[in-house]
Amino acid sequence: MEQLKKNKERLKIITDSIEQGIKDLFESDKYKQYLRTMSRFHRYSVNNTLLIAMQRPDATHIAGFSNWKNQFGRHVRKGERGIQIIAPTPYKKKIDAVKVDPDTKAPILDQNGNAVMEEVEIKIPMFRVVSVFDVSQTEGRPLPEIVSDLTGDVQQYDTFMEALQRSSPVPVSIEPIALTTDGYFSLTEQSITIRAGMSEVQTMCAAVHEIAHAKLHNYVIANAEAEQTQEITKKDQRTKEVEAESIAYAVCQYYGIETAENSFGYIAGWSKGKDLEELRASLETINQTASELIDNIDRHFMQLCKEHGMENALKNAEMSLEDDYDMIDGIINNGQKNVEEKLTEHRPSVLQQLQTTNNSEYKRTALKCAERER
């Protein structure tokens, strides 16, 4: 009981720090740092992403004390302070429940018409505060090197763009349009148009931005899918731009694409007057959409590599750390992975994996994406 009380107290302290962190987050520099952290840990929950950004914003690879030692041959340096995050620690409990027919799902009754009871085991959700450490806090066996610059030839760019197009909910085309915009999502046409003639990186940035709009702000599809009694609440233009630009920034950061210096200077004005739940909801939307888009791009990219006979590039690529709860000491996941609270390790993107197989002479740093005018 004493341990349970201590855990509740630690959870209360860390939850309070999260709430204060959200309030303080919407200053341009802090917000950009949060998005950079989110890009490295895009499957983490908003809470844990924020906790990492607050405690060690430059973290890249995280694991528990024992896992660093046992799985990676590394040890945490003496005196290093752990990063506190929230981890799920569900426990099982047996209870009496009404027995139901496995086919009809109706309660089974005895000869007197009373419900038959049976003992069943249920899982009770619970969370606790755990400490993890970044690779920079450890010493020992080297981890596989991750290439961070966007490099490669035109074939790689074309493959990536095709993966991006397959990840879009609407068709994407590249056409000559006015120089005043990099691209746009059309509600009436249900399509995305990107301006022709831009650099490869600028084209990718614009495409991600507009795909974010198509995924989040497509009210034609939303109204069609909603029940007649439901009313779709449309977001204001500033909120839509904050969400799309944040997603584009995080996704591009994940793939090592150097975007234009976006100060997010407008973020403080946008967040002013919004309550904590509104701000948290926007962060959840940005987090979930960016994570889904990254996963879809990776999946389509790997499929295209197979179609193009590039299996060896993927086969030879080394993943840096495993992608599940096992990186956290004492966590039992029972094969279950909760999307919202998943504490996964950062892994090299499929684009980064291919970089080591391309011509080194062709290596270049990413071009800066011109700041979007809207």
Regions inferred by a protein language model and the residue ranges of each:
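Long, low-complexity, intrinsically disordered extramembrane tails
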Residues: 333-337, 347
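Short acidic, low-complexity intrinsically disordered linear motifs used
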Residues: 344-373
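N-terminal accessory/interface modules of nucleic-acid-binding and processing proteins
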Residues: 1-325, 331, 364, 369-373
